[in-house]
Amino acid sequence: MLSKLLRLGEGRIVKRLKRVAEYVNTLSDNVEKLTDVELKAKTDEFKQRLADEKNPESLDDLLPEAFAVAREAAWRVLDQRPFDVQVMGGAALHLGNVAEMKTGEGKTLTCVLPAYLNALAGKGVHIVTVNDYLAKRDSEWMGRVHRFLGLQVGVILASMTPDERRVAYNADITYGTNNEFGFDYLRDNMAHSLDDLVQRGHSYAIVDEVDSILIDEARTPLIISGSADGASNWYTEFARLVRLMDKDVHYEVDLRKRTVGVHEKGMEFVEDQLGIDNLYEVANSPLVSYLNNALKAKELFNRDKDYIVRDGEVLIVDEFTGRVLIGRRYNEGMHQAIEAKEHVEIKAENQTLATITLQNYFRLYDKLAGMTGTAQTEAAELHEIYKLGVVAIPTNKPMIREDRSDLIYKTEEAKYMAVVDDVAERYEKGQPVLIGTTSVERSEYLSRQFTKRHIPHNVLNAKYHEQEAGIVAVAGRRGGVTVATNMAGRGTDIVLGGNVDFLTDQRLRRRGLDPVETPDEYEQAWHSELPKVKEEAGQEAAEVIEAGGLYVLGTERHESRRIDNQLRGRSGRQGDPGESRFYLSLGDELMRRFHGATLEALLTRLNLPDDVPIEAKMVTRAIKSAQTQVEQQNFEVRKNVLKYDEVMNQQRKVIYAERRRILEGESLQQQALGMVRDVITAYIDGATTDSYVEDWDLDALWSALGTLYPVGIKHESLTHADEDSECDELSRDELLEALLIDAQHAYAAREAELAELAGEGAMRQLERNVLLNVVDRKWREHLYEMDYLKEGIGLRAMAQRDPLVEYQREGYDMFMAMLDGVKEESVGFLFNLAVEAVPASHVAPVEIPEGFTGLVADVEAIRPREEASSALRTKDIDNESTGLTYSGPSEDGSTQVQLNSGGGQKTPAGIPVGASRRERREAARRRGRGAKPSRSVKKR
């Protein structure tokens, strides 16, 4: 219903965009007359008009002229002139909408127009793609247009150094993947120097395949983590146990909800095997998680469908695209359970150091827009989460593809035999065929069947995705047969007769030409080679059209209608003929999860042979209903992820703002003195809770304060015994005032001591380093605590409490306690940290520490306002660097992990190898408490 309401004003928006395109057309004649130099000069003219102090123009004012200029530049450079519908799409993107443009309508070229316009403001434009290949390709291909107009274009790739990233972000337009943009944001907020920052703000982003990135991948947060412990023997032990357990005897499985439940008989079996009395005793509670994960690994995660095993490593397969997600690992011990199941090396679990969801990352942008071929089914979610409207842009030519009704077979074997027969028939007449499967296993099974029938074909799946662009580019040629695990986010058009741009680029690269390295030679060769390729491809395209165009054959319905529509959408681009059909069976996962028994009963009553299909509207309705249910479930999951992350998001904003303030060189003297005041006040409040002065344990208070700073007064001097009482009445306020004055004197003495040691401004330098390192360490500990809290918060529902409300309340309490801890530890370090002077020229660059291993001062990195003649260095610090792990949504699917080398991984002191999360948490708490002076100083 909400989707329908959101579409009510769509017609008016499309009419408005059409008027924009018509106005741009009226400017075309004048723009065409400009020379190349004059066309390029328009960029500087537009910038001056934006910056005019007397009568500045807005980007909206410049839109028609800027679009006309960019359109003409695209024609001169690429031999491609954006159609009116592409101009409409560009205007929709500039206005902050999602432009729904069907496959083959030229989304990549459309993006050039709003990117050029918004780059004129000088704040940077980020263009987000689904993988590194597309980011590099588009930055080179479309970057030719922008460079022709005098703009700088950068690209962010996973392999780049921070210096290379900084250059790319300083360009006018920056291409990259959602993961790279997000991880750079997190890394910037882990940096120890302004010089380490790479991003320069979040002004405007255009997200390609916006539904894939903002919807499908939104369930998976971006996480930077470090090693937390070694592998546990419990994973292996429970993998052995569950192999001995029987489904429906020891445990039950719900495929629809993807859950497992252990029966009483199963618990007794595990208890007998482990020799324990009660699995659910507090001491044994970590074992329950191992058992549940082992059962899920056995029943819910299937080899060659959900993951593959390659070179002794478990690699996750993306459910949406069928690609291998190199390095991706499930959280909460799930990946270790699968490794134990497959008898491969069990790798250590990680501890979160920084995290953000894609929803909250993209909401950082002042303006956000996106492009996709399928967005209407998700219009409500895009509006609710991101405040993005969806505008359906008309196709340039009418769609004439024929979408055939589904064929349903009783068995999977009969279905696949029918698929092979159909493909063989199409191949004989020269019609190209694209077959979509949902798993690597199915694609390889079909490949073997085609080989038996001597049908030449290409396989495009998780195991061979390196060659995917080349395979897709020729998938529309005569007699081409392509088997693909899924077609979401492939990024290369299937053009009848072959993709002309790709084939031309391929030929030029074989000759050693590159659009970035050798731009002049490349441009010259492009214009001479392109007509030849067009002529060759045009002749073949005519033959393919005669044969019926591209035939898309789906072998299974996906749980998302969008993925099905994306597969269909590969055929019938730009008014070409085409055809699509889905072959289904009762063994398909969607059928088994929803209404499988009903459909099987229907086929049994009809008494049809296995190889005879049925076409029934009832089945189509059942499938649509099932897909709608799954989509709604996934929407609820994503909303739930966002609700929980919103708690962290508010806390993250506070911490990141504080870090940035420290980095940017503001004087922290008043803040440090404020911390001293707050901590001493808290100690005194803890010591004076008893109403009678004689009950105060001032000796304990002085002892505790002595661990913070060198106390210069004795409490005896504050009290004077007389004849009538043990001591004069001493008020809490008098005690506080005396100690605060004493602490201020001690702080001034500490500052003088450091000034003598390392020169004027040394104390400011120490303040900056102490606060930065303490904030980082306490924030990491807090993330760990919040992970643990969220892990078990769902159990609060059993006590009739809302888990989200409980998470918000306890998360807030933990955050405030963390801030108190930051103050307490910072004060202790400021007064007591042993430092030495080091000539500034000999100071090594500061490395980002894995944990709180020390405070390293660096004049250049920290940039204090008052320069010290020498740098400060803490003594007896073991600087340990540990490799970081980057976990987030895959390039165009669910999740991936990227490892960053950085020294040997060590288990933190005091934490046993193989420790459970609960054990690690308690050890971390004990370790953290060791450095803190106790506040409990009341007299007993």
Curated annotation (Swiss-Prot):
Known EC number: 7.4.2.8
Reply yes or no: does the keyword Electron transport apply.
Answer: no
Enzyme kind, highest EC tier = translocase
Q: Name one GO cellular component term.
A: cytosol
Q: For this UniProt record, give its keywords in alphabetical order, as a comma-separated list.
A: ATP-binding, Cell membrane, Cytoplasm, Membrane, Nucleotide-binding, Protein transport, Translocase, Translocation, Transport
Q: Which GO terms describe its biological process?
A: intracellular protein transmembrane transport; protein import; protein targeting; protein transport by the Sec complex
Superkingdom in the source lineage: Bacteria
Q: Where is the composition biased (Polar residues)?
A: 880-900
| Positions of ATP binding | Q86, G104, E105, G106, K107, T108, D493
Pfam families annotated for this entry? P-loop_SecA, SecA_DEAD, SecA_PP_bind, SecA_SW
Q: Which GO terms describe its molecular function?
A: ATP binding; protein-exporting ATPase activity
The cellular location(s) given in this protein's UniProt record come to: Cell membrane; Cytoplasm
Q: How does it sit in the membrane?
A: Peripheral membrane protein
Instruction: Provide the catalytic activity annotation.
Output: ATP + H2O + cellular proteinSide 1 = ADP + phosphate + cellular proteinSide 2
The answer to whether UniProt assigns keyword Cell membrane to this entry is yes
Q: Where is the composition biased (Basic and acidic residues)?
A: 867-878
**Where is the region Disordered?**
867-940
Residue spans of biased composition, Basic residues class: 923-940
Q: Which family does it belong to?
A: Belongs to the SecA family.
Spell out the subunit comment: Monomer and homodimer. Part of the essential Sec protein translocation apparatus which comprises SecA, SecYEG and auxiliary proteins SecDF. Other proteins may also be involved.
Q: What does this protein do?
A: Part of the Sec protein translocase complex. Interacts with the SecYEG preprotein conducting channel. Has a central role in coupling the hydrolysis of ATP to the transfer of proteins into and across the cell membrane, serving as an ATP-driven molecular motor driving the stepwise translocation of polypeptide chains across the membrane.
Q: What is this protein called?
A: Protein translocase subunit SecA 1
